[in-house]
Amino acid sequence: MTTTISQLNITPIKFTINDLIVDPVSLSENFNCPICEECIMDVNKCEALQCKEGHVHCRLCWMKSLESKKECMTCRTRVNSVDSLSKNIYLQKEFRNKKIFCPNLFRILNSGKIEIDEKFGCKEILKVDELEGHIKECQFQFIECPNDKECKTRLRKNQLKDHAEKCKKLKSECEFCGEKGLVIDDSKVHYSECEKFPIKCPQNCNSPTFNCTIERGRIKYHIENECPFTVIQCKYREAGCMLEFPRSELSEHMKLIDHSKYMEATIDQHICKFEKSEKEYKKLELEYNRLKDDFKILQSELKVIRELKFNYQNKWVITNWSQKLQDYPKPKSIESPEFMVGNLKFKIQFYPNGGLSDESKDFLSIYLYKFDDQTPSKVQFSFELLNKDFTRNRKLASTNIFHTENKWGWRSFINNSLVTTQTGFVIQNSVTLNINIEILPEEKEAFTS
């Protein structure tokens, strides 16, 4: 019977009991299956299955036989299933006491065969019953390098520490920039790009005199501002000193060359720049003051706009009503005085005998008229014809968009036969109209995306 030993991250190694047993002779015929002639037990499952007559066979042979016949292969005794078989406790106990080698004594050759590893294998000899506990702790079992999936090195568990120190796939942290997860194989590439990696100055200022190494990311700054070998210009170049020299010679240059005339020229240049800046400042100051005044004007205008009233309430009393009915036949209108609501100009057109349309015949028509204005305006308005009995007042309201010179209202506000003294709408030969107007704010379009 074949024994399988699983090891960490490794394809299981298959052994036979004859590979592991210390004394093969001790495996008498009692331990062999009479059908397949293999050992009836293995180190992973120590069970000797027998029929009620005591005939022992290996589990595999029992399973194959019972698929076709429900009987013992030796005595033909009825056997319903593998689970109905009993165990030979004596054989099992004797097998568990057999001495075996640790499976980790062996190694697999490229051919797939196994051989004893005299140098690195586990030399432990133990009872079959002790194998399971030993395998869990054995430091000689084979594993794969855990550092990276790319490292396919196969080694024993007790060799892992030495391997990790030289594994080319070992992950580490850059000691300069702190980047984590670097693989040793790739570290040279990283160090060739690492901004914190110390390198020599390209101008070789790392001589014993200067002993200079710089982080790669600071090289440009170092050359432009620090490196003693960088050739620089005299700070009085604009004033006329055109000499160039290494930065390390700056002090010597300043000592050897008289820069007084250059200093005077520099001072003159600064004076000119200052005077020019002063003129620019005064010019900007004037512009600032102008803008400040403009801002105050705009604030005042804004205040006026905010104080504009965007609603209007009033009464319009039309006197001598009986005469007006005669003087203003259809479609002639009585017009109110002009009035302002906010910054918009309106008037009311009142038709005692109806307006232009045929539908307005015999009706009193009334309209709100907006004068020329380029901006469309949303207006909410109402007209209320008062009655002696206020519960009988006639009131209509509407909300409309007014464009340039247009009007909104009602062609059939009320039948003019109802506007009489008897009905209460004419009081002392006058009719009174309540006017309510409100300019509504502009509606903003919703954002869409």
Swiss-Prot record:
The answer to whether keyword Endoplasmic reticulum applies is: no
Where in the chain are the RING-type zinc fingers? Answer: 33-76
| Keywords, comma-separated and alphabetical | Coiled coil, Cytoplasm, Metal-binding, Repeat, Zinc, Zinc-finger
Q: Where do the TM regions start and end?
A: none
Q: Which residues form a coiled coil?
A: 263-309
Q: Which CDD domains match?
A: MATH
Q: What Pfam families does the database record attribute to this sequence?
A: MATH_2, zf-TRAF
Specify the superkingdom: Eukaryota
What protein name does the entry list?
Answer: TNF receptor-associated factor family protein DDB_G0272340
Q: Which organism is it from?
A: Dictyostelium discoideum (Social amoeba)
